[in-house]
Design a protein with these regions (language model features):
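Short, surface-exposed polybasic-aromatic patches that bind anionic ligands, especially phosphate groups
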Residues: 9, 17-188
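N-terminal low-complexity segments that are often proline-rich with Ser/Thr-Pro
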Residues: 4-7
């Protein structure tokens, strides 16, 4: 479970972040139902093409900043019933009807991906990811930007953590905050 004393779970614990309290991403324990991203894969046989894919990615510069890594300074925030929710103005990256326009929990002291706060200053993905275990929901938004009292955001998705999603996840044609149809936090 998410520790009540740690409002921020930092997937990049080496980066300067908004909180000194860091919890491992393995402590998230998202999605109670049997979904693909909750399956323990340690005992599975490695794909015969795995090494060649990793070698190709490494020789091509890896992901992002030229390094093979799974973290990019993504903060997974913890919300509870007292966390205020804010409505946002959709940007041109909000795709109706595939995205959810619902108020988002905005925990105090949090940050969007790649930033030390809620303002998206670097023109990056600026994902806002919030887990509310009391609601059993995962909120994810792409290109979130809160500047003063103005909150704008691209595609936003709310995942039901207790739901057993079908093979097409949120449904044919639906997207997600990562544009691939998958929950970001569950795959960190």
């Amino acid at each position: 479970e998410l520790p009540a004393s740690a409002p921020i779970i930092d997937v990049d614990p080496d980066a300067a972040g908004p909180s000194s309290q860091v919890t491992s991403p393995t402590d998230l324990k998202l999605f109670t139902a049997a979904n693909p991203w909750t399956k323990n894969v340690k005992a599975l046989t490695k794909s015969s093409s795995s090494d060649s894919i990793i070698n190709w990615l490494s020789s091509a510069g890896g992901w992002g900043g030229g390094t093979m890594k799974i973290d990019f300074g993504i903060h997974v925030l913890n919300a509870d019933a007292s966390t205020p929710k804010k409505s946002f103005t959709p940007t041109s990256e909000f795709y109706t009807p595939d995205c959810d326009n619902v108020p988002f929990p905005v925990p105090s002291g949090g940050a969007v991906e790649g930033e030390s706060g809620y303002q998206c200053t670097m023109d990056g993905d600026c994902h806002l990811i919030v887990v509310n275990k009391g609601e059993n929901k995962l909120y994810e938004m792409w290109r979130a930007n809160i500047s003063g009292s103005t909150f704008k955001g691209g595609c936003a998705v709310v995942w039901d953590l207790a739901k057993q999603y079908p093979a097409n996840l949120r449904g044919e044609g639906c997207t997600s905050a990562d544009a691939g149809g998958f929950p970001i936090a569950a795959m960190l």
